[in-house]
């Protein structure tokens, strides 16, 4: 299974501006929503295989990230800590069976392979229409994709009749998530300073609706952020109706948004004369449990990203921009770190 995310022609730092003011979901929120949805899909598949009826299902994921160092000195580095997944379930199975289903859900989750496999992401770099060799980051072995500008110019809203309305929505007046009040620290900025030492706590909580859709609520728990609702459905290939994006789509979108945010942040702080940046990002996963009848260990390929930079800087500074974007990205850090998910039943 593969997902492709293409983004581009975004003014520097504008990706973070909407989320800064709570008007749109923040990049890490997409990733957490995708992780929750993936765990839920796997739990549902394993329960069906065991002929266990699900009467209620809620999955909570807590992600912790860190950022420390100086952008201008090249020491700033993003980091990701182990994920905590809490399953709150009511089924026709025993407590022991519910515990087993939770562990199977995480073990077979294609999304979780991205965390536990410790794989360096790979890149190509295009500078003002000319492909440059990458330096500190790992190089992609594939041919660089074409400039995605034409794709954006031709893009039109989909006309799928069954697609749900309001798949992304800010929830007004909500200040609790997972039964706890959001944290006590408010962030006054998005970190556009040279020196950083911060930790970010993101929480996502998903519930299974009676119509089979997954309703996900996600917030930056610390520092405090707005609560957003995501709707998710599985692809038709695994029994879904495709009424909303799948977990892997949200996960992949979060990765690309986070990376682009870091590119924009570095360009802003380093005062790069960058007028455009675009990416084409491919993520590939082995099939989920619904299609994995042999119970083979799930795998994923390295996140593969083509980066297109338009600027008035020299090639060396453009290569540094890519290096620092990858180095400070919370989610590329998660991919290369080999994170184990901690599981519990609530």
Please provide the spans of the model-predicted regions.
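Extended beta-strand/beta-hairpin segments
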Residues: 1-33, 44-253, 264-346
């Amino acid at each position: 299974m593969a997902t492709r995310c293409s983004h581009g022609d975004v003014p520097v730092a504008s990706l973070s501006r909407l989320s800064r003011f709570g008007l749109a979901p923040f990049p890490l929120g997409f990733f957490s929503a995708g992780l929750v949805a993936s765990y839920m899909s796997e739990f549902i598949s394993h329960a069906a295989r065991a002929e266990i009826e699900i009467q209620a299902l809620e999955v909570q994921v807590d992600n912790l990230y860190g950022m420390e160092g100086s952008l201008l000195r090249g020491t700033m580095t993003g980091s990701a800590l182990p994920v905590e997944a809490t399953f709150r379930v009511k089924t026709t199975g025993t407590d022991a069976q519910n515990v087993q289903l939770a562990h199977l859900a995480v073990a077979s989750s294609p999304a979780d392979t991205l965390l536990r496999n410790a794989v360096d992401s790979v890149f190509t770099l295009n500078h003002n229409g000319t492909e440059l060799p990458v330096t500190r980051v790992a190089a992609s072995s594939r041919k660089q994709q074409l400039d995605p500008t034409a794709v954006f110019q031709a893009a039109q809203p989909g006309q799928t009749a069954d697609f749900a309305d309001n798949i992304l929505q800010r929830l007004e007046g909500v200040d609790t998530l997972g039964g706890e009040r959001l944290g006590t620290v408010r962030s006054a900025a998005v970190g556009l300073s040279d020196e950083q030492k911060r930790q970010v706590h993101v929480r996502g909580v998903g519930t299974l609706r009676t119509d089979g859709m997954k309703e996900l609520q996600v917030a930056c728990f610390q520092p405090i952020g707005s609560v957003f609702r995501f709707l998710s459905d599985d692809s038709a290939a695994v029994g879904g109706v495709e009424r909303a994006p799948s977990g892997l789509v949200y996960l992949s979108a979060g990765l690309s948004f986070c990376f682009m945010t870091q590119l924009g942040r570095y360009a802003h702080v380093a005062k790069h004369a960058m007028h455009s940046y675009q990416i084409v990002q491919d993520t590939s996963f082995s099939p989920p449990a619904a299609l994995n009848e042999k119970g083979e260990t799930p795998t994923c390929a390295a996140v593969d990203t083509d980066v297109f930079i338009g600027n008035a800087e020299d090639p060396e500074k453009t290569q540094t921009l890519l290096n620092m974007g990858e180095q400070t990205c919370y989610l590329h850090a998660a991919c290369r770190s080999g994170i184990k998910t901690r599981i519990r039943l609530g």
